[in-house]
């Protein structure tokens, strides 16, 4: 209304001015101006201004009352004329909704959702229309859109369908058929496990293993003279492969615990017992090396009582068999005990329907691609079967046994090699058969998306933790600097930045010399896993940082050499090879490649490499020892110098070596001599039995009769890493 009045007022003023211009008096003034007889500017302004002022006064007085009346009315309009309060739009959401679902629920374009998620921790580029959003991101989008969130009562029903493959439920008892037992041989290193298996199957597996130590799991089907069959898993016994032993216990029916009669219970023996108990697998005790003269089987049984392994002789249910793997004595009794226990367990499986199994080991073969060793636990495996394991799948091209013989079918309890995997599954992964390749891809995609979602949740937790840490640091900073003057605050911050200054070149070299980047390559998945588990025990980072740059399977490649060159690292290979071209390339780039076939040697080599990165230490080597018999002072100029009269007890004192003074077993001084005399002659060496006088480079030190003077030299010696891998 005020705007309209203002326009009316301006219009009336303009109209008044126009009338004045066209009046006779005004026309006369304009004519004078045209003919050059214009009056002075002040007179002109007075004439026109007076009339304008009078007109303005008339218009102002006419409109003043009306303007006030309108303004009063506009100040408080009637309640009925007030615009209604806008309420936020309510959006119904549910757990697990996709980007497309959220956009549809908001009645917005899908780009609005992407725009709302910009500048957040979520990777917008990786989002698709069917990507599932966590609750925190759903709330964020709704908040930025200025809407109100409402959780759907049916949100549980809207969660996406689980598309994973799972094991079948219980089987009809009528379909169950007896199967061979799967037996895992466990025990301490070099207690004779592989030799025992070698005798049972009459092969030379033990001779094929480097150093007689099994490096990774072997699965074998052993046929006994009685016609019975037993599947044996031979797991390594030394500390590096405890994870592989644990995996063996997860797929086994019976554990044969091998303990040497002369060594007794060892560290890995105890670990094997724990693995069996955790998996709730019964134990058969095989006391090996009973042919030795110092064998004591009864001592072994008594030692095992402390670990709740009670033999039948002591009222327990654990069968104990005394054997000699070297001579073959009593091995049939061990096999019969295994079969007897299997009969008690009534081991059965369903050979029909989709296949179920477990990956025992996996590796990459140059000519055949990814290969797995597996134990079939249910169903019958055939060529052409579609399998999924972990996040990889296969269309079976080839099935073979432990001897390389091609098989058409594989039944429950059979150990087989499988070829046809698209990617390499991990040892311990569950094998499941699905109906088709599209279904296999669907399962893999589901598992990858689940893993990605879990990773997103973990990342969110980490971000939240970092946010809390940042807030706490900010709060502490405010408490620290809040009461200080800005000059004091600036000075303190300057000192703190100075302490965190960039390293100088020399310091940088010293810092880098205390870091060892390494690359690990192994022949099979289980071996690499065992090495990584060993590296997890590294606890000497205060001496030298151990950085794992890369690990993988297969022979050393050019990429590995490039990695090592980039990080100035060392390549360690276990049961793999490096071609001549690779070795030549590594030599040109200054990259070390270290290949080993026994894990002990690899770890020892790694310890030596770590030790080489450590600074040398100084060790004292005594040269001679003398006792102080008397003390006196000698005047030189204005100084009085204390002198000790000594007699050499051991070795000799050399003038230019280092000395230390010991009193009551405590070192009270270290340094050099200023003089060494025999009678009045300066000499450089005093031998055993001779008397001498000596003075120190520190005059404040007081001698006392009975003190010991030690002459020594310092030598630099290499420092050994304190890391103990547990062998």
Curated annotation (Swiss-Prot):
Keywords: GTP-binding, Initiation factor, Mitochondrion, Nucleotide-binding, Phosphoprotein, Protein biosynthesis, Transit peptide
Chain's role: One of the essential components for the initiation of protein synthesis. Protects formylmethionyl-tRNA from spontaneous hydrolysis and promotes its binding to the 30S ribosomal subunits. Also involved in the hydrolysis of GTP during the formation of the 70S ribosomal complex.
Residues covered by region (G4): 288-291
Chain segments carrying region G5: 324-326
Pfam families hit by this protein: EF-G_D2 (PF22042), GTP_EFTU (PF00009), IF-2 (PF11987)
Modified positions (Phosphothreonine) in chain numbering: 688
Protein name: Translation initiation factor IF-2, mitochondrial
UniProt gene name: Mtif2
G3: annotated span: 234-237
Residues annotated as domain tr-type G: 178-346
């Amino acid at each position: 209304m005020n705007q309209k009045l203002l326009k009316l007022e301006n219009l009336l003023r303009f109209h008044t001015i126009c009338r004045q211009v066209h009046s006779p008096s005004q026309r006369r003034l304009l004519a004078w101006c045209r003919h050059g007889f214009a009056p002075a500017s002040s007179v002109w302004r007075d004439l026109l201004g007076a009339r304008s002022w009078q007109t303005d006064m008339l218009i102002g007085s006419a409109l003043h009352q009306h303007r006030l009346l309108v303004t009063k009315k506009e100040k408080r309009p009637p309640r009925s004329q007030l615009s209604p309060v806008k309420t936020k739009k309510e959006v119904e959401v549910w757990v697990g909704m996709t980007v497309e679902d959220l956009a549809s629920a908001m009645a917005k374009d899908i780009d609005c959702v992407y725009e709302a998620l910009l500048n957040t921790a979520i990777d917008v580029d990786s989002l698709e229309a069917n990507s599932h959003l966590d609750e925190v991101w759903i709330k964020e989008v709704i908040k930025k859109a200025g809407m109100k969130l409402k959780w759907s009562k049916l949100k549980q029903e809207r969660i996406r369908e689980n598309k994973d493959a799972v094991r079948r439920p219980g089987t009809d008892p009528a379909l169950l058929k007896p199967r061979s037992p799967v037996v895992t041989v466990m025990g301490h290193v070099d207690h004779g496990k592989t030799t025992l298996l070698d005798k049972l199957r009459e092969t030379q597996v033990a001779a094929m293993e480097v150093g007689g130590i099994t490096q990774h799991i072997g699965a074998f089907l052993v046929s006994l003279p009685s016609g019975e069959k037993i599947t044996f898993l031979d797991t390594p016994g030394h500390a590096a492969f405890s994870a592989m032993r644990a995996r063996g216990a997860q797929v086994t029916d019976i554990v044969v615990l091998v303990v040497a009669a002369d060594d007794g219970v060892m560290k890995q023996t105890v670990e094997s017992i724990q693995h069996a108990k955790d998996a709730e697998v019964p134990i058969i005790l095989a006391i090996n090396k009973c042919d030795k003269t110092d064998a004591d089987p009864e001592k072994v049984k008594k030692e095992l009582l402390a670990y709740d392994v009670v033999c039948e002789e002591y009222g327990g249910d654990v069968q104990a068999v005394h054997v000699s793997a070297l001579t073959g004595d009593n091995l049939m009794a061990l096999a019969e005990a295994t079969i007897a226990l299997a009969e008690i367990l009534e081991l059965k499986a369903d050979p029909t329907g989709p296949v179920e199994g477990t990956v025992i080991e996996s590796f990459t073969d140059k000519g055949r691609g990814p290969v797995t060793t597996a134990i079939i636990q249910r169903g019958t495996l055939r060529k052409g079967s579609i399998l999924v394991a972990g996040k990889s799948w296969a269309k079976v091209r080839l099935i073979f046994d432990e001897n390389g013989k091609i098989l058409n079918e594989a039944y429950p309890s059979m150990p087989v090699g499988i070829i046809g995997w698209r990617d390499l599954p991990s040892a311990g992964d569950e094998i499941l058969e699905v109906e088709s390749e599209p279904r296999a891809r669907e399962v893999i995609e589901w598992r990858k998306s689940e893993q990605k979602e879990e990773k997103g949740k973990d990342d969110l937790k980490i971000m939240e933790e970092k946010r809390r840490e940042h807030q706490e640091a900010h709060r502490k900073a405010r408490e620290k600097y809040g009461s200080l003057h800005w000059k004091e605050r600036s000075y303190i911050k300057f000192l703190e930045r100075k302490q965190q200054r960039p390293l100088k070149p020399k310091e940088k070299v010293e810092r880098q010399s205390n870091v060892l980047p390494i690359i690990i390559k192994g022949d099979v998945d289980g071996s690499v896993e065992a090495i990584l588990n060993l590296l997890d025990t590294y606890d000497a980072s205060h001496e030298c940082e151990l950085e794992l740059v890369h690990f993988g399977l297969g022979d050393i490649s050019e990429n590995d050499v490039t990695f090592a060159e980039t990080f100035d690292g060392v390549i360690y290979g276990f049961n793999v090879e490096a071609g001549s071209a690779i070795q030549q390339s590594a030599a040109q780039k200054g990259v070390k490649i270290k290949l080993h076939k026994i894990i002990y040697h690899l770890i020892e080599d790694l310890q030596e490499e770590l030790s080489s990165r450590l600074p040398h230490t100084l060790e004292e080597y005594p040269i001679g020892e003398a006792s102080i018999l008397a003390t006196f002072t000698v005047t030189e100029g204005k100084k009085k110098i204390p002198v000790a009269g000594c007699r050499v007890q051991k070795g000799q004192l050399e003038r230019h070596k280092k000395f230390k003074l010991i009193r009551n077993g405590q070192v009270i001084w270290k340094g050099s001599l200023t003089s060494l005399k025999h009678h009045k002659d300066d000499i450089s060496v005093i031998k055993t039995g001779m008397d001498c006088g000596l003075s120190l480079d520190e005059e404040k030190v007081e001698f006392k009769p009975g003190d010991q003077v030690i002459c020594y030299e310092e030598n630099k010696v290499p420092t050994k890493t304190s890391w103990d891998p547990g062998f």
